[in-house]
Amino acid sequence: DNILFRVETGGLFEDLPRNSQGQAIIADARNDENLMIAGIQVAFLKFHNAVVERVRTATDLDGDAAFAEARRIVTWHYQWLILHQFLPQFIGQALVNDILANGRQHYTTLVPTIPVEFQTAAYRFGHSMIRPSYRANLAGDKGEAFFGMVFDPSEFGKSDPGDMTG
């Protein structure tokens, strides 16, 4: 099916589609930088596929039209998450409310895009807040925690992996 995104599994969890060298086959290689980012990418791929199926059953759209509608819906959900979950955590609900009430202070286009200021500033700020590890799976390995090490793999196996304070 050429409008669904491929998602792979090694039998334990979903993963990004990969080539024979293990490189993710995705539009932006940065979305495979670490376990958590790759997991978010997989979640959006799966969400897109579910939306495609919903569009196909709820409308008469198929092919490129179904893909475009699914893309529009997924993009809207992503933007909703940024506005209602991400931004309030970083800039506070009061500033989000002010922007919604009084408008943004930059020129806009008719094309729905993420402003470059957000791409380069807010996401970089978010990257600086990353933890050294994330508990990634409690269901596998007889309930033992699996830590996805983001920085120092030598911390693997410790009950409380070290942080970045040195």
What are these regions (language model features)?
Residues 1-36:
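An N-terminal structural lobe/cap that precedes and organizes the functional/catalytic core
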Residues 24-27, 61, 112:
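Short, well-ordered helical secondary-structure segments
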Residues 30-32, 37-39, 43-44, 50-52:
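Fold-level signature of zinc-dependent metallopeptidase catalytic domains
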Residues 42-45, 64, 68, 72:
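Conserved structured core elements
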Residues 51-68:
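Inter-helical turn/loop segments and adjacent helix faces that build the functional surface
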Residues 69-166:
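Extended amphipathic alpha-helical segments with heptad-repeat/coiled-coil character used for oligomerization
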